[in-house]
Amino acid sequence: MIQELNKTSFKKLILFLLITIGGTLVYFTFTDMPSATASGSVLVDKIEQSDGWGVIAVDPYTFKVYVTNFKSTTVTVVDGTTNKPLSVIEVGKTPYGIGLNTDTKMLYVALEYNDTLAIINTTTGEIIKNIDLVDPYDIAVNSKTNKVYVTSDKTNLVSLVDGSTNEIISTFDVQKPCGIAVNEATNMVYVTSESTNKVHVIEGSKNNLVTTIDVGKSPRGVVANPYTNTVYVTNQLAGTVDVIDGSKNEVIDTISVGNTPRRIVVNPDTNIIYVSNQISNSLSVIDGATNEVIDSIPVEQPFELMINPKTNKIYTTYSGHSILSIVNDVERNQNTLDDSKTIIGMLGAGAIAAIIAFFVIQKKKLKPEQKF
């Protein structure tokens, strides 16, 4: 009798262990795997200065950050490793928009109320040329083709500058152009128009306007992911981001973000998008694979925005104000988007093991006793 009880207890113990192991595996699958939605972002630094920060450009290879000082006549150079200002470059009155050719190391600065585009050699810190340009505002640079695109809402023009000659070689008619971005992989240029609620698409190889795309209310920021050929546009008065398929020039999704989204950047390596929500005092974090907001990072009055994809540091300012905020975001693991299959598999394995053990015990119970 005691021997039979021991056998039964042993079988129950085996069943319990199988269930426990299955449950433990599932638990660790849920708790230990990296999560794309877990916030690991940290506001690591704030740099304050009285001249009023403007727009930001980043060199991901030298880790230098260039920020215009709108209330002054300078561009501040920040060490992206230490987050400390290194130097200032004299450029002229009311510097606002800024763009960098990461190959030639030429910096382009829009002196908005000085009707000038300043071109600076970042190696020497010297201005090599000033180009007369009425009310220049936003700048996008294609480092591969050495072309520079500059918007001017006062003239309703986008000007194209040849970086090899530093001359304006073409202009494009765009009603109230605002934000501008280049997809270096496809050589396509995207320009937002706040007053018409459209995005204008320019083909860089032929220098012609190919189409316009209807988007949300008051579009401003725009960015392209060269790896996925996807374009993202912030709609300030709609509180949304429109997602555009670059191969079709069609809006394929609309994402709700915070209040008054201004600018937008993407880390193409992680396929993560960041949006500055000025009134919400936050950065929305979007997963480019699912087009879902996966996080919100608290930041005071974010407006202008730039990212170093190598360090995943995000830089944001509120134009004309005194604070440059630096956010260090974790590198989010995109493989976690497929981990649901792993979870289901582990659950299934644990359940099957428990069921098999149960039936083995039941079968043993149903066998007739053997008499010796």
Which role does the model predict for each range below?
Residues F28-D338, F372:
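Predominantly soluble domains enriched in secretory-pathway, periplasmic, or organellar proteins
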Residues I355-F372:
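C-terminal membrane-anchoring or membrane-association module
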Residues Q334-G348:
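Juxtamembrane/start-of-transmembrane alpha-helix segments at the extracytoplasmic/lumenal side
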Residues K7, K11-K12, K206, K365-K367:
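Polybasic, lysine/arginine-rich low-complexity segments
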Residues L18-G22, L347-I356:
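Core hydrophobic alpha-helical transmembrane segments of single-pass membrane proteins
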Residues M1-L5, P368-K371:
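N-terminal Lys/Arg-rich, disordered targeting/topogenic segments
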Residues I2-S35:
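Hydrophobic secretory-pathway targeting helix
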